Curated annotation (Swiss-Prot):
Its cofactor is Cu cation. CDD domains: CcO_II_C. Residues 1-14, 88-227 are mitochondrial intermembrane. This is Cytochrome c oxidase subunit 2. The gene is MT-CO2. Cu cation A2 binds at C196, E198, C200, H204. GO terms for molecular function: copper ion binding; cytochrome-c oxidase activity. It comes from the Eukaryota. Residues 46-59 are mitochondrial matrix. Its main location: mitochondrion. Pfam families: COX2, COX2_TM.
């Protein structure tokens, strides 16, 4: 999860988030190189007296500044398209969880189980225990098995919401009348926090998401106790 004065991204917990972090670094390096080149050219223009005010055209320069931006765009587009494909591809999920957004809470349904569903509300500040996180704790966590592909079906009962867990690289809009899907795969156990990321009304900031990733055996015991 995020911590005060954090400058970088949250620690990656899923393969998708690892790819997104690498792509961020890749793109940032390209932006840094372009910015350095532009600043260098500007500094030369300001400090040198060797200018060509009478030059009408320069085929070599025009060729370079046409081909170079195109090549840079390709270097950005190819890994981006690859990650977009990975985010949309779901291969043999072991579990499907349906998530519905409401004003202002989330409800979850494990479609592979009978009668395994619950609502998840934020715990008010005056009911928090020592060590709990303000505006992030919920009364019912979403318990999922780690290291396995899980399909999340996401929609809304009323207005636009967005189901987002940054450390897993997840952000999927919850749209009334439409069913969107996302893949969840965690590399390690733990608690992972998110929030509604679409302005949805007065209590928009009071819709936290808590995923509890556990080993498969623990998940089976939990699901058996809930059914």
């Amino acid at each position: 999860m995020a911590y005060p004065f954090q400058l970088g991204l949250q620690d990656a917990t899923s393969p998708i988030m690892e790819e997104l972090t690498n792509f961020h670094d890749h793109t940032l390096m390209i932006v840094f190189l372009i910015s350095s080149l532009v600043l260098y050219i500007i500094s030369l223009m300001l400090t040198t007296k060797l200018t060509h005010t009478s030059t009408m055209d320069a085929q070599e320069v025009e060729t370079i500044w046409t081909i170079l931006p195109a090549a840079i765009l390709v270097l950005i587009a190819l890994p981006s398209l690859r990650i977009l494909y990975m985010m949309d591809e779901i291969n043999n999920p072991v579990l499907t969880v349906k998530t519905m957004g409401h004003q202002w809470y989330w409800s979850y349904e494990y479609t592979d189980y009978e009668d395994l569903c619950f609502d998840s509300y934020m715990i008010p500040t005056n009911e928090l225990k020592p060590g709990d996180l303000r505006l992030l704790e919920v009364d019912n966590r979403v318990v999922l098995p780690m290291e396995l592909p899980i399909r999340m079906l996401i929609s809304s009962e009323d207005v636009l919401h967005s189901w987002a867990v940054p450390s897993l690289g997840l952000k999927t809009d919850a749209i009334p009348g439409r069913l969107n899907q996302a893949t969840v795969t965690s590399n390690r156990p733990g608690l992972f926090y998110g929030q509604c990321s679409e302005i949805c009304g007065a209590n928009h900031s009071f819709m936290p998401i808590v995923l509890e990733m556990v080993p498969l055996k623990h998940f089976e015991n939990w699901s058996a106790s809930m059914v």
